[in-house]
């Protein structure tokens, strides 16, 4: 407030300076003869008249006199002093005018006034807070401070006399001292005009009492009978100033005091008005602030509400539009909520299903696997943990069974007891079907594998039986062949024996024809014997009944012996029989009889299939074995025939037209025998040019044979 | 010691053939058709040698050879197996049973007598 005042005072000061300057300028130019110097007394009684912070005179009276001076072309001189000094200076003529003077009968003797009052004022008693002064009578016996020689003093003394009160009046030179001693409790109360009191009581922690008295008008005063021109000029201007609400006068009042100039209104109404105003303003301000706060709060709430709505909408969309079944159900198995997807999935509308038991609608009592789902649903709230994820069969309205993978969440009430269950489900029927299909396929595969295994077992058993049968048959065959061989030999023994006896002439001389025919019988019987021997050999070999008897002998001797045996046949066909045995060829350990059988066989074949040229027997050692080759210049072998050459009963030119003798078993026996000796037989041939059969014979077949 | 040979052979033709051939070469022949008679004849006549067929009715050649060898007086009489058995081990088996020699049927009439002589003491 003070700060506010001081700013205004400063402004007023500048305005005053400006006004002063403006009033001086015309007088300066118009000549000093017209420039009337007017001396004005100044004392401290803000806001009516006082010295502002910068030491310049200010106040309502100052504003008025400045205005009048400006209009009149006066030059103002201020003379500062106390109230009493001011009054003395007026009477002594030291100053022209003293402001703020209220006329009284006594004063009328010393001072002259103008007619139109500058201000009207009341006197009021101010006291420290809680003084209990409520009426004029409460001032009885109290010490009351009052301005020296002031009209208040005069007025209060009149009141004192009138009410017969015994109050002590303490006079002070200025208002500041007045309030100060009241604050310091040197006096009980102070009397001042309301202009000053209103403005400064607060600063001194004083309150205005209900004691208000003596309304008075305030004027500029001059020494009695003097300065009438000044007083008249003041009246003239004041009259016009008071008519114009925008005049300097009202602006000054507005500037210096909050008090309205409705002096005619009773004070309590003004006070009330002021209070109401203050209340109204405060109420308005408060309501504005409240309104503002409400608006802000409302906006905040709206925002929150909007956010909530958006959020809720989002969640609702999420729940309703989700491609999962979202289900809420009570602990007693009733459906509380099912989202759009779920409704569509199960084939119900909302009114059809909400509130219904799950087992009457979407859950079959018995799963196709045989589980009792009714029991499980009753079980879920109690043993929730076990069912947080649960796959079970459900049923659609049309009766279709579906498999759902459920994720369950238990919702509890305030007491922590199970209230409802939130279930989110995904249809896994295709998955389940695929799984079942895979399981079925697996079972089929297992069955198939078992079948296969059984087939293999059966087949193995069959094969074992067959093999046993074959082996038995083999034995039987061998036994049969052995028996046959024996049975054939017995009559053959007689045939060969008697033929020989007859041919030897032991039974008497034979003629030439008899000799010739008996010779034929002998040949045939020998061939028959060879056939029987070969068949016996092959059957023995195949039955594994042929065992070799090894001995160490000279290979050269064996070769030469066999060559010697075949020599007559070769000679008969005029074939050259060449023998080339390396010098180093000597001992060999193998079955001599069987080796010789092989060599004879090869030599016989060579002679048999060669019509001209030669037969050559070559033998040489090579590392741990001997190579023995029988080479001829005979008919040779067609390449196609070579592969089957060593098979039993094979003979080139098979059929009725064959011209060679032989069993067709020879080479197959040779091959089997040489293999039993851990050797090998190979053939090279060019059809029409000849063949070479080569034996590869280990020097000691026992080493690797093991027999 | 005479030149008597005992032939134990159940086949009449074979017996006759061998008897003819051997008699032509100066031997005298006693013959039986079975082993039992053969043993009896051997003990009775103590021949220079015994020609023994293997496949015989009732007692086979192995049994006969074994039985003969139990008699002390038979110890020095060669037993020559003449047989059409030609399976592996036949020769070894008969020699083990007590035979001195082994001739395979069919015989070679040109060499048969010489082969027999080879076994005679």
Per-segment meaning from a language model:
Chain B
Residues 9:
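Conserved acidic carboxylate
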Residues 57, 66, 75, 87, ...:
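The feature encodes the CheY-like receiver
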Residues 45-51, 56:
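Active-site beta3 strand of CheY-like receiver
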Residues 26-33, 41, 103:
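Short hydrophobic/Thr-rich beta-strand motif most characteristic of the beta2 strand and flanking loop
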Residues 107-116:
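C-terminal output helix
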Residues 16-24:
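Charged docking surfaces used in two-component/phosphorelay signaling
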């Amino acid at each position: 407030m003070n700060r506010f005042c001081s700013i205004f005072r400063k402004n007023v000061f500048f305005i005053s300076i400006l006004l002063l300057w403006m009033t001086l300028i015309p007088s300066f130019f118009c000549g000093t003869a017209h420039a009337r110097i007017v001396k004005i007394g100044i004392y401290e009684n803000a806001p009516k008249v006082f010295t502002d912070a910068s030491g310049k005179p200010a106040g309502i009276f100052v504003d008025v006199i400045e205005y009048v001076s400006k209009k009149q072309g006066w030059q103002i001189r201020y003379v500062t002093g106390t109230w009493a000094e001011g009054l003395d200076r007026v009477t002594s003529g030291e100053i022209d005018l003293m402001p703020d003077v209220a006329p009284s009968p006594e004063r009328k003797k010393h001072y002259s006034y103008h007619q139109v009052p500058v201000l009207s004022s009341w006197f009021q008693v101010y006291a420290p807070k809680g003084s209990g002064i409520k009426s004029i009578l409460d001032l009885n016996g109290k010490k009351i401070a009052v301005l020296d020689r002031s009209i208040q003093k005069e007025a209060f003394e009149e009141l004192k006399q009138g009410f017969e009160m015994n109050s002590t009046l303490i006079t002070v030179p200025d208002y500041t001292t007045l309030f100060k001693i009241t604050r310091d409790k040197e006096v009980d109360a102070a009397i001042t005009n309301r202009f000053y009191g209103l403005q400064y009581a607060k600063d001194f922690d004083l309150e205005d009492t209900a004691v208000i008295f003596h309304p008075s008008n305030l004027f500029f005063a001059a020494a009695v009978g003097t300065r009438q021109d000044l007083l008249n000029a003041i009246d003239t201007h004041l009259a016009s100033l008071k008519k114009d609400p925008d005049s300097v006068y009202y602006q000054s009042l507005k500037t210096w005091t909050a008090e309205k100039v409705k002096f005619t209104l009773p004070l309590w109404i003004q006070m009330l008005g002021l209070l109401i105003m203050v209340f109204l303003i405060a109420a308005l301000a408060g309501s504005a602030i409240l309104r503002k706060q409400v608006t802000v709060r409302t906006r905040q709430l709206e925002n929150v509400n909007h956010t909530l709505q958006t959020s809720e909408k989002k969640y609702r969309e999420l729940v309703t539009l989700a491609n999962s079944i979202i289900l809420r159900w009570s602990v007693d198995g009733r459906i509380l909520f099912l989202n759009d997807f779920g409704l569509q999935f199960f084939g119900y509308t909302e009114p059809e299903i909400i509130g219904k038991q799950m087992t009457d609608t979407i859950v079959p009592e018995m799963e196709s696997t045989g589980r009792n789902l009714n029991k499980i649903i009753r079980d879920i709230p109690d043993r929730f943990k076990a069912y947080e994820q649960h796959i079970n069969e459900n049923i659609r309205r049309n009766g279709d069974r579906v498999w759902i993978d459920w994720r369950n969440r238990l919702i509890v009430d305030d007491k922590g007891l199970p209230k409802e269950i939130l279930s989110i489900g995904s249809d896994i029927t295709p998955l389940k079907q695929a799984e079942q299909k895979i399981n079925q396929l697996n079972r089929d595969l297992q069955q198939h594998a078992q079948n296969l295994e059984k087939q293999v077992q059966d087949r193995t058993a069959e094969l074992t039986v067959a093999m046993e049968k074959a082996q038995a048959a083999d034995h039987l065959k061998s036994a049969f062949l052995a028996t046959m061989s024996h049975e054939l030999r017995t009559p053959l023994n007689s045939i060969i024996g008697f033929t020989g006896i007859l041919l030897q002439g032991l039974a008497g001389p034979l003629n030439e024809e008899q000799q010739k025919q008996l010779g034929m019988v002998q040949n045939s019987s020998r061939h028959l014997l060879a056939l029987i021997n070969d068949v016996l050999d092959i059957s023995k070999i195949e039955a594994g009944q042929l065992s070799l008897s090894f001995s160490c002998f000279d290979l050269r001797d064996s070769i030469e012996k066999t060559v010697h045996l075949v020599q007559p046949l070769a000679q008969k066909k005029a074939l050259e029989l060449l023998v080339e045995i390396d010098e180093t060829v000597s001992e060999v350990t193998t079955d001599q009889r069987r080796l010789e059988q092989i060599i004879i066989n090869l030599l016989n074949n060579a002679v048999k299939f060669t019509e001209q040229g030669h037969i050559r027997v070559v033998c040489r050692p090579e590392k741990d074995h001997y190579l023995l080759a029988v080479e001829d210049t005979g008919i040779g072998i067609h390449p196609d025939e070579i592969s089957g050459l060593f098979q039993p009963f094979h003979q080139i030119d098979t059929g009725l037209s064959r011209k060679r003798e032989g069993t067709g078993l020879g080479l197959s026996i040779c091959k089997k025998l040489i293999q039993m000796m851990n050797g090998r037989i190979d053939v090279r041939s060019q059809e029409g040019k000849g063949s070479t059969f080569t034996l590869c014979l280990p020097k000691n077949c026992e080493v690797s044979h093991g027999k | 010691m005479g030149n008597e040979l005992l032939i134990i052979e159940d086949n009449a033709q074979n017996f006759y053939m061998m008897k003819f051939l051997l008699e032509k070469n100066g031997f005298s022949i006693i013959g039986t058709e079975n082993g039992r008679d053969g043993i009896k004849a051997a003990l009775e006549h103590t021949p220079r040698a015994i020609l023994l067929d293997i496949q015989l009715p009732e007692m086979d050649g192995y049994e006969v050879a074994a039985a003969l060898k139990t008699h002390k007086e038979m110890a020095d009489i060669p037993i020559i197996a003449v047989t059409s058995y030609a399976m592996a081990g036949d020769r070894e088996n008969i020699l083990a049973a007590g035979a001195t020699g082994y001739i395979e049927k069919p015989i070679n009439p040109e060499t048969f007598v010489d082969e027999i002589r080879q076994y005679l003491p």
